[in-house]
């Protein structure tokens, strides 16, 4: 008798997932390209065990967020719009101001836009750690350096 082939789709279980820590130096990295790769690692799309409805991704630490590069004239022209839901509660922040005050928010905003906007996306987003300078408190996790494809 011949062996029968199994055509069952593999679905990862939350307990089976092996998570690693990655570190990215954002200095002179283009924001959008870097954010796309970070989102893929957070989701786990770089692993063969990727399952869309399960958190199979890894942790990502981003350093030097204040030195991120923006292509074109985005550093001067790009703005972020938010509203407090009160009359006159419009708030418009430019990237230039945010990079001076809270440079972490620029990378977090870009990555959040590339993750699913549901409970799973919020869970994935918690695995992103962004720091303005080169120091980070995650040395004990032994993060692996990750290169960004340009």
Curated annotation (Swiss-Prot):
One GO molecular-function entry: structural constituent of ribosome
CDD domains given in the database record: Ribosomal_L13
Record-annotated disulphide pairs: none
Biological processes, Gene Ontology terms: negative regulation of translation; translation
Endoplasmic reticulum among keywords: no
Annotated keywords: Ribonucleoprotein, Ribosomal protein
A Pfam family annotated for this UniProt entry: Ribosomal_L13
Signal peptide extent: none
Gene Ontology cellular component terms for the protein in this record: cytosolic large ribosomal subunit
Acetylation in keyword set: no
SUPFAM superfamilies the record matches: Ribosomal protein L13
Entry's family note: Belongs to the universal ribosomal protein uL13 family.
Subunit structure: Part of the 50S ribosomal subunit.
Function statement: This protein is one of the early assembly proteins of the 50S ribosomal subunit, although it is not seen to bind rRNA by itself. It is important during the early stages of 50S assembly.
NCBIfam families for the chain: rplM_bact (TIGR01066)
Alphabetized PANTHER family for the sequence: LARGE RIBOSOMAL SUBUNIT PROTEIN UL13M, RIBOSOMAL PROTEIN L13
Name used for this protein in its record: Large ribosomal subunit protein uL13
Gene designation per UniProt: rplM
